[in-house]
Amino acid sequence: MKKEVTVESFELDHTIVKAPYIRLISEEVGPKGDIITNFDIRLIQPNENAMDTAGLHTIEHLLAKLIRQRIDGLIDCSPFGCRTGFHMIMWGKQDSEKIAQVIKSSLEEIAEGITWEDVPGTTIESCGNYKDHSLHSAKEWAKLILSQGISTDAFERKPI
């Protein structure tokens, strides 16, 4: 007999959210009391656009570095298959407003301060698809996202 499961992100009505936003998906408590917090980092409006894979890939590599420079406890920040944002998984209880600030400042650095030499994991030894990167695209997406403002609410625009 198969266990019935609900996948939260498939229950979310993607037609009513207003990207870009940061949304707390869940706080899970492990068997020893450890808390893991999962965020929806939605940068592009679902079903209206999607990031090209090269730009998304470069943003992914940069966020892996930039988030860790700004906040402790990052477990992973991985792109959605739909290419509209990322899952961000953290140790402990985390504040959505703080996460929004971290993402905003990371995107600001991508848009204005990053050079190709700053992008980690771009060699054949360090990346499984090292030829599929575009810093130009990453910068353009970061600028577009920042121009729209990052909201702390998925359903009502409350840009930080």
From Swiss-Prot:
Catalytic activity field: S-(5-deoxy-D-ribos-5-yl)-L-homocysteine = (S)-4,5-dihydroxypentane-2,3-dione + L-homocysteine
MF (Gene Ontology): iron ion binding; S-ribosylhomocysteine lyase activity
UniProt xrefs under Pfam families: LuxS
Record key words, sorted: Autoinducer synthesis, Iron, Lyase, Metal-binding, Quorum sensing
Superkingdom of this protein's organism: Bacteria
This enzyme's EC code(s): 4.4.1.21
Cofactor: Fe cation
InterPro entries found in the cross-reference section: LuxS_sf, Metalloenz_LuxS/M16, S-ribosylhomocysteinase
A GO biological process held by the record: quorum sensing
Chain segments annotated as transmembrane: none
Cofactor notes: Binds 1 Fe cation per subunit.
UniProt binding sites for Fe cation: H57, H61, C127
Classification via NCBIfam families: PRK02260.2-5, PRK02260.3-1
Binding partners and assembly: Homodimer.
Protein's job: Involved in the synthesis of autoinducer 2 (AI-2) which is secreted by bacteria and is used to communicate both the cell density and the metabolic potential of the environment. The regulation of gene expression in response to changes in cell density is called quorum sensing. Catalyzes the transformation of S-ribosylhomocysteine (RHC) to homocysteine (HC) and 4,5-dihydroxy-2,3-pentadione (DPD).
Family label: Belongs to the LuxS family.
Name assigned to this protein: S-ribosylhomocysteine lyase
Species the sequence originates in: Streptococcus suis (strain 05ZYH33)
Encoding gene per record: luxS
